[in-house]
């Protein structure tokens, strides 16, 4: 995949999917950078896994999601979060037809989005890839989500050489593993950090 354009010559349609405040905080600078770059057409899809704090991050960065799945329901189980996210992201992929899907971290929303993209044969880019504790149950379910996401990822963007090395020890193709730190600092006065 190149960053020049799609096969039709237009900008790359990159779907960024998140559902929690930490994901939003980490992906918001990427969303705004892509919106300022004519090579990209970012599509923001929010699952709403953690509804209450997403809006303040969106307001801070001036982001209006293209699609809000609004899956949050009091007392929902991990199975319900996964099911609602998988179905909702699947519908969003069919509607927007992205060239790639970006997920961040280890949430259930990230796992479901990666799986939906894989099912639609859309490349997955995983930001903050390769983090491992060595115990699939700790933290739960995040460690399992990390490992599952890595199985369907086309490009692993690792925050450290240690996380890169974790993926290489798991026999991940070195050609799809990059050490990549987000190239932007925390904005001054950012109260949402």
Briefly describe each language-model feature range:
Residues 9, 37-39, 63-64, 119, ...:
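Short, well-ordered coil/turn elements that cap or connect secondary structure elements
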Residues 38-84, 88:
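Conserved nucleotide-sugar phosphate-binding/catalytic loop shared by glycosyltransferases and other
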Residues 65-68, 124, 176-179:
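Conserved beta-strand scaffold positions in the cores of enzyme catalytic domains, especially
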């Amino acid at each position: 995949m190149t960053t020049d354009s799609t096969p039709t010559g237009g900008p790359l349609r990159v779907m960024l999917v998140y559902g929690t405040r930490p994901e939003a905080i980490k992906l918001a600078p990427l969303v705004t950078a892509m919106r300022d770059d004519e090579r990209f057409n970012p599509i923001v899809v929010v699952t709403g896994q953690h509804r209450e704090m997403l809006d303040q991050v969106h307001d801070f960065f001036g982001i209006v999601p293209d699609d809000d799945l609004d899956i949050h329901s009091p007392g929902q189980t991990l199975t319900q979060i996964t099911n609602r996210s998988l179905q909702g992201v699947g519908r969003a992929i069919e509607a927007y037809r992205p060239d790639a899907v970006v997920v961040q971290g280890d949430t259930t929303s990230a796992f479901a989005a990666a799986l939906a993209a894989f099912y639609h044969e859309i490349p997955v880019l995983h930001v903050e890839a390769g983090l491992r504790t060595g115990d699939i149950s700790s933290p739960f379910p995040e460690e399992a989500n990390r490992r599952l996401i890595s199985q369907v990822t086309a490009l692993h963007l690792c925050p450290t050489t240690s996380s890169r090395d974790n993926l290489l020890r798991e026999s991940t193709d070195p050609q799809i593993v990059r050490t990549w730190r987000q190239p932007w600092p925390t904005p001054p006065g950012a109260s949402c950090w």
